[in-house]
Amino acid sequence: MQKLIIHGGKPLKGIINISGAKNAVLPIMAASILTDKLHITNVPKLTDVSTMKELLKSHGAGIEIIEHENEFELVINAANINNLTADYEIVRKMRASIWVLGPLLSRYGKAKVSLPGGCAIGARQVDLHIAVLKAMGAEITIEDGYINASTAGRLKGTHFIFDKISVGATINAVLAAVLADGETLLFNCAREPEIVDLCNCLNKMGADISGIGTSEIRINGKDSLSEASYRVLPDRIEAGTYMFAAAITKGDLKLYGIDYHIIENIALKLIETGIKVMPIDNGVQVTYADKLNAVNLETNPYPGFATDLQAQFMSLMTISQGSSIITENIFENRFMHVPELCRMGADITVRGNQAIVQGVKGLKGAEVMASDLRASVSLILAGLSTDSETVLHRIYHLDRGFQNLEKKLNNCGADIKRV
């Protein structure tokens, strides 16, 4: 099994180009089921993207891959879907597989989707997905680990209030409603930029969606959608990770291809710690200043601080001056990186959904193990901050969400080897 060997102590300096957003491209790929052909550009080279390609092919879609040095183009032809079952062997690899449920049901009136897998960071149940589809008239049962959904005729437009904000359920609801009969009003929706990107793509395909980027989305269902081309937005989680990498290594990085407004909440939190963050043309520059202050953090739905950056921020706080409290409000069991950081000398105490981080003078290299995608990159950041060697095991998580991470960091002065 592969591992990373990280020799830290080197300030990162240089330029990093941000890849397309994983959390946008996956639902957009699922949206291809709603039309005959969809051309997607700025697609990142990730194992999760490969898994979604495998899933779409299993349904009968044809996929043309146009490979460039730093991205893919995908041309997905879903005119001949012939299998409405999303099999466990594929779905277990990635929770985003659940997003084929809404499109299959809406276009074909039937779907059978295995209960999903992915990172082990909490229950993340599908109850809200099922509830909103039932509100549209679907008949749904769960048997033998599969969601069985069907509808007599088209799904019906509905008014639905999400009991809690859910990115995944908002996505499935939108994907189902665009071909439903009548108007759908969704309340208490997630507002993430990746949902905005999905809605913009669907509108380019001929959907009628308004309220995009707000908590109230209005969808007038269409009889069909048309072919379209769409470029995926840049990955704010990747950008935030490299912003923290500049800070934790006392470096100076310029990140290009990212819109500052979608990372502004990250920038403001870094500025609060004493790091210098400046918008530049088509990107952002992050520069270490004189010190790193400890600050508190709470994860919340967008526009709050992203849970997908919590672990990386915690790594930064382990070497800050003072004590910080990090509160995880989105997922339970998302502090699995804490014991590994403590192996490197961090001083962290977990109490429920809070982690109290007492900054130390510096971390020490150690052998550590990644439990999930975001934990893996947080341990890389920690390793980069040390003046010794860190060995990271179970790095298969990393390739699910970060394209060419070692190459991008090594080009800026890091010393990371995959063996």
Swiss-Prot record:
GO MF entries: UDP-N-acetylglucosamine 1-carboxyvinyltransferase activity
Key words of the record: Cell cycle, Cell division, Cell shape, Cell wall biogenesis/degradation, Cytoplasm, Peptidoglycan synthesis, Pyruvate, Transferase
- 2-(S-cysteinyl)pyruvic acid O-phosphothioketal modified-residue sites: 119
Q: Which SUPFAM superfamilies match?
A: EPT/RTPC-like
Its UniProt entry gives the catalysed reaction(s) as: phosphoenolpyruvate + UDP-N-acetyl-alpha-D-glucosamine = UDP-N-acetyl-3-O-(1-carboxyvinyl)-alpha-D-glucosamine + phosphate
Binding residues annotated for UDP-N-acetyl-alpha-D-glucosamine, in chain numbering: 95, 308, 330
Q: Which Enzyme Commission numbers does its entry carry?
A: 2.5.1.7
> Which pathway does the UniProt entry assign to this protein?
Cell wall biogenesis; peptidoglycan biosynthesis
Q: Name one GO biological process term.
A: peptidoglycan biosynthetic process
- Gene3D superfamilies registered for this protein in UniProt: Enolpyruvate transferase domain
Q: Subcellular location, in the record's words?
A: Cytoplasm
Uppermost EC category: transferase
Q: Where is phosphoenolpyruvate annotated to bind?
A: 22-23
The main location class comes to cytoplasm
The active-site annotation reads 119 (proton donor)
Question: Which regions span the lipid bilayer?
Answer: none
A GO CC annotation given for this chain: cytoplasm
Q: What does this protein do?
A: Cell wall formation. Adds enolpyruvyl to UDP-N-acetylglucosamine.
Family in the record: Belongs to the EPSP synthase family. MurA subfamily.
According to UniProt, the name of this protein is: UDP-N-acetylglucosamine 1-carboxyvinyltransferase
The gene is: murA
